[in-house]
Amino acid sequence: MSRSYYRTRIKFCGMTRAGDVRLAGELGVDAVGFIFARESSRRVAPAEARAMRQAIAPMVDVVALFRNNSKEEVREVLRTVRPTLLQFHGEEDESFCRSFNMPYLKAIAMGGREEVNARTLQLRYPSAAGFLFDSHAPGGGGGTGVAFDWSRVPTGLHRPFLLAGGLNPENVYDAVLATLPWGVDVSSGIELEPGIKDGYRMRTFVEEVRRADCTVLE
């Protein structure tokens, strides 16, 4: 996706504490994510996410992440949390994803061996607001803390994409330069333990993304 200026969007995912949500806003992060996937160690209840939502700064997106949840589970989150963007990490098809009449990202597993084709993705999910390339294998979940080969990101996408999977303050500079993503998504790379973010790593991650943006513009 061609761009005449460059600012990589940043999403912090797997938030479980209001203080971390508040710091994300102070650092200028564009979106925070709450995980509702049943098997995730960072899963929060809708009521917990609603309480943390009060700490979100203005103009910061609230992303609700699902993986093979039922329609009723998704609707409960919509009613309780009022997210601005949905993110689907499972085997959800196009019909399921668009049935909630909200913008959504579809996560694509990059941990397998098969080639990921941009045209195929866009035909399979024509209503997606964008795609998120993560390092999990097909059928698996995200949050592994392991990066994939960034050269496998498909070319020819005509909508935004986010890079995820194993990103951290030590490698995100190189990741941005290698893939020029619309945005980056991080969870375990800024944590002390699952769901518990580290303020120093949060701040350093943002600084490294901005340093990469300045390099792109040179």
Swiss-Prot record:
Alphabetized GO MF terms: phosphoribosylanthranilate isomerase activity
Name of the top EC class for this enzyme: isomerase
Keyword Lyase: no
UniProt key word Amino-acid biosynthesis: yes
Biological process terms in GO annotation: L-tryptophan biosynthetic process
Key words, A-Z: Amino-acid biosynthesis, Aromatic amino acid biosynthesis, Isomerase, Tryptophan biosynthesis
Source organism superkingdom: Bacteria
The EC number(s) this enzyme carries: 5.3.1.24
Pathway membership: Amino-acid biosynthesis; L-tryptophan biosynthesis; L-tryptophan from chorismate: step 3/5
Catalytic activity: N-(5-phospho-beta-D-ribosyl)anthranilate = 1-(2-carboxyphenylamino)-1-deoxy-D-ribulose 5-phosphate
Gene3D superfamilies, A to Z: Aldolase class I
Pfam families attached to this UniProt entry: PRAI
Entry's family note: Belongs to the TrpF family.
Name of this protein: N-(5'-phosphoribosyl)anthranilate isomerase
Organism whose genome encodes this protein: Stenotrophomonas maltophilia (strain R551-3)
